[in-house]
Amino acid sequence: MATSTTTSLKEFLSVFPQLVADLRALCLEEYQLPACVWDRFESTLNHNTLGGKCNRGLSVIDSVRLLRDGLELSPAEYFDAAVLGWLVELLQATMLVLDDIMDGSPTRRGKPSWYRVPGVGMAAVNDATMLESAIYMLLKKYFAGRAIYLPVVDLFHETALQIELGQAFDMLIANEGTPDLTTFVPATYSQIVTYKTAFYSFYLPVALALHAVDAATPTNLAAARAILVPMGEYFQVQDDYLDCFADPTVLGKVGTDIIEGKCSWLVVQALQRASTDQAQLLAENYGSASGESSVKALYSELDLESVYRTFEEQRVAELRTLITGLDESQGLRKSVFEELLGKIYQRRK
């Protein structure tokens, strides 16, 4: 067992086979389903849950350790935290499968998107729902009858709905690639990313950790949310920047925000700075494959890379101020938030 406050990916990955075995037993032994059904489920699990950085899942374990002031977790405590972490990764996998279909993304994590794998296609929609349902079966197996069970079930249900509502807002405002750019304003962007990204990527792992150490008081949850939502927005701004400016071979996927007409941070910033002619260029080209190069050229003309770097430093300074003022009297720890911020600051993929 690692003694540092940062768990290793190898250690975290070592728990996954047990969860796969649990689901295998459910399908083949309890449900008596044919092997072909389990084979499909297992392929779905392995392709979509593995292969990423697992930052969300690892954050659950790291947060539990930090909330316990860096004390080494017992094997049972580590396993519980790792299970909760893997359930966050299953929720992430669910949403990525569906997001890739809606965005038409050809790759994910350097591999073909699941729906692009031969023999999968639109059946990936059902595969995604299997991934989400697995969350609740595993929660039942490991936490039923314990005090955290119902609050954590509720937390996963609410978080899933938040993501889905954020995704719906994102798609509606993109209007199938023909967006009304007058609606692309900072307040709208902030609301979309709060629900689409911030809650599940940042608030969920820490809230789960607070439940795991019996410190999920209303005060602590509210304080965590006040820091983690703007941190999650910063993370999504990074994603939007990387979607346009990062090397796809490094990022592991091909950016599609411009082609899809998404309400990206970059286009919101461009619209705030554009002249009348530049705004017209955006209106004519944003949301089409043929106009992507023109939009990227305009982003360079407006020096949005510098705008992004300025935003990053300002947001990080604001977050550090919030962390400094955090009340630790009910068991919350500043180190939880410092650790998360350190992981994402100036990331390049």
UniProtKB/Swiss-Prot annotation:
PROSITE patterns: POLYPRENYL_SYNTHASE_1, POLYPRENYL_SYNTHASE_2. It comes from the Eukaryota. GO terms for molecular function: (2E,6E)-farnesyl diphosphate synthase activity; dimethylallyltranstransferase activity; metal ion binding. Keywords: Magnesium, Metal-binding, Transferase. InterPro entries: FPS1-like, Isoprenoid_synthase_dom_sf, Polyprenyl_synt, Polyprenyl_synt_CS. Isopentenyl diphosphate binds at residues 53, 56, 92, 109. Viridicatumtoxin and its derivative, viridicatumtoxin B, exhibit anti-methicillin-resistant Staphylococcus aureus (anti-MRSA) activity. Moreover, viridicatumtoxin and a C2 acetyl analog, spirohexaline, have been demonstrated to inhibit bacterial undecaprenyl diphosphate synthase, a potential new target for antibiotic development. GO terms for cellular component: cytoplasm. It is an enzyme of class 2 (transferase). Mg(2+) 2 binds at residues 99, 103. Binds 2 Mg(2+) ions per subunit. Its EC number is 2.5.1.10, 2.5.1.1. Coiled coil: none annotated. Its cofactor is Mg(2+). Dimethylallyl diphosphate binds at residues 108, 196-197, 236, 253, 262. It catalyses: isopentenyl diphosphate + dimethylallyl diphosphate = (2E)-geranyl diphosphate + diphosphate; isopentenyl diphosphate + (2E)-geranyl diphosphate = (2E,6E)-farnesyl diphosphate + diphosphate. One of its GO terms (biological process) is viridicatumtoxin biosynthetic process. Mg(2+) 1 binds at residues 99, 103. Pathway: Secondary metabolite biosynthesis; terpenoid biosynthesis. Farnesyl pyrophosphate synthase; part of the gene cluster that mediates the biosynthesis of viridicatumtoxin, a tetracycline-like fungal meroterpenoid with a unique, fused spirobicyclic ring system. The first step of the pathway is the production of the malonamoyl-CoA starter unit for the polyketide synthase vrtA. The aldolase vrtJ may be involved in the synthesis of the malonamate substrate for malonamoyl-CoA synthetase vrtB. Belongs to the FPP/GGPP synthase family. This is Farnesyl pyrophosphate synthase vrtD.
